Amino acid sequence: MRIAVTRERGVGERRVAISPEAAKVLVAAGHDVVVESGAGSAAGMDDADYGSAGATIAPDRAATIGSEGLVVSVQGPTDSDALAGFTEDHVVVGLLDPVWNPEAATSVAATGATSYSLDLVPRSTRAQSMDVLSSTATVAGTQAVLTAAYRLPKLMPLMITAAGTIPPARLVVLGAGVAGLQAIATARRLGAVVEGFDIREEALEQIRSVGAKS
């Protein structure tokens, strides 16, 4: 199978759909992996890394997607330039977000291409190997707290000094999904007093399990 890896064009998007390590596995399995030049640069993976893995480096997007095959990306195509070249012989896989951004999925469908949105894969043991959303949410939950700690005008942990005691910061995390639970765990490790809130009754025990009040 021909597998195309396109460069992400979203503002601030630094991810790439397939790493050189994954490309090497796919090539070894007999697939033809084509990577758009610069696709992994923002993630610290250059064209030489992909070339060493056996992938072909294409100079632009048109040459990358070709006339048929599987096209993988993190975010789905969002404009006419990104949609150009898709045909009924293409299969698009990525985080297309059809619930909140139905126009993107509709635009892909209008080209005749088949699309699969990985953000709709259920969180189940059977589908765990395809659950890219949970890994992304884990990173987001961690980074959210680190950013908050940087911007917070006080220290996170309790500090007892000769000059006095500094009470710990108090954080409230709304939502106890993957990102929320990771945010709670990160804040607890930084020494904050954390409370979690979720409308789901079953989430209360999960909130307590990572050390927060519910």
Whereabouts are the PLM-identified features?
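Short linear motifs at secondary-structure transitions and domain/linker junctions
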Residues: 7-10, 46-49, 65-71, 122, ...
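Short, hinge-like loop/turn segments at secondary-structure boundaries
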Residues: 50-54, 132-136, 211-214
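A broad detector of short, well-ordered amphipathic alpha-helices
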Residues: 66, 139-142, 146, 181, ...
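Short Asp/Glu-rich motifs
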Residues: 44-46, 69, 126-128, 206-207
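Glycine/serine-rich phosphate-binding loop and adjoining beta1-alpha1 elements at the start
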Residues: 2, 8, 81-170
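An N-terminal-biased, well-structured beta-alpha scaffold segment characteristic
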Residues: 5-107, 111
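Glycine-rich phosphate/diphosphate-binding loop of Rossmann-like nucleotide-binding domains
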Residues: 6-42, 154-214
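Acidic active-site catalytic centers that drive phospho-/nucleotidyl reactions
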Residues: 69, 119, 198
